[in-house]
């Protein structure tokens, strides 16, 4: 666990110190004082009464001794409870389909003042240019947008075609950037465990920062070896004992509740007073519809309190201080003298009802954020341009030949989980022996002119129609599932025509589609418009059968080879437990 102060993130000049100390002593006027407020004590439990005094970006003092202190402006909290700004310990903003600018507009008013982001989605498509854009957005954001340098581009060497590489030399060029907190999730855990020098070189280069992990279901000697390499955390745990063992071995546990991967219920009972400094909250992938209707980290805190009886100070601790401490962000995570004034005022702390947000000492106005969004996005110089280098397809491209009596491998989806199971199904003249089997294909979109990789999918709930998307982790080729080759081709051609996006086809017609013009991953629409379009997509998808809650997000992970057990990449069917390609027909 990285508990050291990373001085790179705590810039304060001597003049600022003198001004801050003068206000703390009571010798100078504060910029803001928040009155009529109780501060939730994340360290001891309980509450602290009294004002919060702010000078510039920082808290100058807390407590009743400042009741009569002078200020340029006073904020009446009207009896609210103050907590530190929320921190998402691990996410890919691209998976929200929003730009970093739009994401800030959607989440900052909900109390999300800090994010630790791995932009490996856009880096897989555009390489260093994608990372550079995220850095520009982070530099101009009010929200604290920190970046982990993407470590595995592609996710697993030799297993898929992606749009770009991100070499160690390129990674090192960003290591000392003021918004960089460390090395992003090291997904090639077999390579780390076996001691591959190229991976150890990356770990060594970032060892003074935070090293993110990714090891779903890993245990035994392999888990020990992975941690021994220096990996400090994992957000992929989905079983109670798995999470407990990682904590026992010194890993910090990121409890994830995204739109597809929902692990909070399985892991929440692990959180207690003793281990909460080692526990954090993250979303990984959460779409704008859920953010608008349920919330972001605020939704996770609410569930910890209401459904899992986690004490208030512990729930808010894992949503702020624990994460700040883990990443060496010593200026964040507490409402205390000298800390950055990232403050969330709650009219109801148990329901996480956000009344007002301050970040870097300034109150946030949601309407102002919305009004400035277009100009700030333009200022960031987004990397526009068509990233889909693929000719239209026909139904014959998805033709598969099956022999009666033969057994074939089927990817079995598990609703609301990223892992899949591997099963087999026997083909007869009447079709497969289970009626949930549909077709899946992955088409590379980077000009390699490869034929589609085709396979079988079960458990997804698709009874008719087809879904296609250019969001398919982590290489972001085109993934399509369907009941007929004709409708699969129609869906694929729509997302090609759109320059990337999502599409639902049913009854031989496009029912709904969403263009994603930035890297085939993100829209430039507002969060509200995106939420409405996603609502329409989900409604159209529901007509195709009893699909997962978030069908497109879950579909996007069917091509990610670093999460078990059976996946399909542009290169073919991949066994995520043996870390090797396998055949569609079972011949063993």
UniProtKB/Swiss-Prot annotation:
Gene Ontology terms, MF aspect: adenine deaminase activity
Name this polypeptide is given: Adenine deaminase
Any GO BP annotation: adenine catabolic process
Lineage: Bacteria, Pseudomonadati, Pseudomonadota, Gammaproteobacteria, Enterobacterales
Subunit structure: Homodimer.
Organism: Escherichia coli (strain SMS-3-5 / SECEC)
Family to which this protein belongs: Belongs to the metallo-dependent hydrolases superfamily. Adenine deaminase family.
Enzyme class: hydrolase
Gene: ade
Domain of life: Bacteria
UniProt cofactor(s): Mn(2+)
NCBIfam families listed in its UniProt record: ade, PRK10027.1
The protein's Enzyme Commission number: 3.5.4.2
Alphabetical keyword list: Hydrolase, Manganese
Keyword Transcription: no
Keyword Thylakoid on entry: no
Recorded catalytic activity of this chain's protein: adenine + H2O + H(+) = hypoxanthine + NH4(+)
């Amino acid at each position: 666990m990285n508990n050291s102060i990373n001085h790179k993130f705590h810039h304060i000049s001597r003049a600022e110190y003198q001004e801050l100390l003068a206000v703390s002593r009571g010798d100078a006027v504060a910029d803001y004082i928040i009155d009529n407020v109780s501060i939730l004590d994340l360290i001891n439990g309980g509450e602290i009464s009294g004002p919060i005094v702010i000078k510039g970006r920082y808290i100058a003092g807390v407590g009743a001794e400042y009741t009569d202190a002078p200020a340029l402006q006073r904020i009446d909290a009207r009896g609210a409870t103050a907590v530190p700004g929320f921190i998402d310990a691990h996410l890919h903003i691209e998976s929200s389909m929003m730009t970093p600018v739009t994401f800030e507009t959607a989440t900052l008013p909900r109390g999300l003042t800090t994010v630790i982001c791995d932009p490996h989605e856009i880096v897989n498509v555009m390489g260093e240019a994608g990372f550079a854009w995220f850095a520009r957005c982070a530099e101009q954001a009010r929200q604290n947008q920190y970046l982990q340098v993407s470590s595995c581009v592609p996710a697993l060497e030799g297993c898929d075609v992606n749009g770009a590489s991100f070499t160690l030399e390129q990674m090192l060029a960003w290591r000392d950037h003021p918004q960089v907190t460390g090395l992003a999730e090291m997904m090639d855990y077999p390579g780390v465990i076996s001691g591959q020098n190229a991976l150890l070189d990356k770990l060594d280069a970032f060892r003074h920062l935070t090293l993110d992990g990714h090891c779903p279901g890993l245990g035994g000697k392999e888990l020990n070896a992975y941690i021994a390499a220096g990996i400090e955390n994992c957000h992929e745990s989905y079983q109670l004992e798995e999470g407990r063992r990682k904590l026992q071995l010194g890993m910090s546990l990121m409890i994830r509740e995204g739109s597809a991967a929902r692990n909070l219920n399985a892991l929440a009972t692990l959180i207690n007073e003793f281990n909460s400094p080692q526990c954090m909250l993250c979303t990984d992938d959460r779409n704008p519809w859920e953010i608008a209707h349920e919330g972001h980290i605020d939704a996770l805190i609410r569930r910890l309190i209401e459904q899992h009886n986690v004490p208030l100070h512990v729930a808010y601790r894992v949503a702020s201080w624990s994460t700040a401490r883990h990443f060496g962000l010593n200026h964040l995570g507490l409402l205390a003298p000298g800390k950055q004034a990232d403050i969330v005022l709650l009219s109801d702390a148990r329901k996480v009802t956000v009344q007002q947000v301050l970040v870097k000492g300034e109150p946030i106005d949601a309407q102002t954020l919305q009004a400035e969004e277009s100009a700030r996005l333009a200022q960031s110089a987004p990397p526009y341009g068509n990233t889909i280098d693929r000719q239209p397809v026909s139904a014959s491209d998805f033709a598969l030949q099956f022999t009666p009596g033969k057994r074939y491998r089927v990817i079995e989806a598990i609703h609301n989980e990223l892992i899949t199971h591997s099963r087999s199904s026997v083909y007869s003249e009447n079709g497969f022996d289970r009626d949930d089997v549909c077709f899946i294909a992955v088409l590379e979109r980077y000009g390699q002119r490869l034929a589609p990789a085709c396979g079988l999918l079960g458990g997804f709930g698709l009874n008719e129609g087809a879904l296609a998307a250019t969001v398919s982790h982590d290489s972001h080729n085109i993934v399509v599932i369907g009941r007929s080759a004709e409708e699969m081709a129609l869906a694929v051609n729509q997302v090609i025509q759109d320059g990337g996006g999502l599409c639902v086809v049913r009854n031989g017609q496009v029912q709904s589609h969403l263009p994603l013009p930035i890297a085939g991953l993100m829209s430039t629409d507002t969060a509200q418009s995106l939420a409405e379009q996603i609502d329409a997509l989900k409604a159209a998808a529901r007509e195709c059968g009893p699909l997962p809650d978030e069908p497109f997000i879950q579909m996007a992970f069917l091509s990610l080879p670093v999460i078990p057990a059976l996946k399909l990449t542009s290169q073919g069917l991949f066994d995520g437990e043996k870390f090797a390609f396998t055949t569609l027909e079972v011949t063993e």
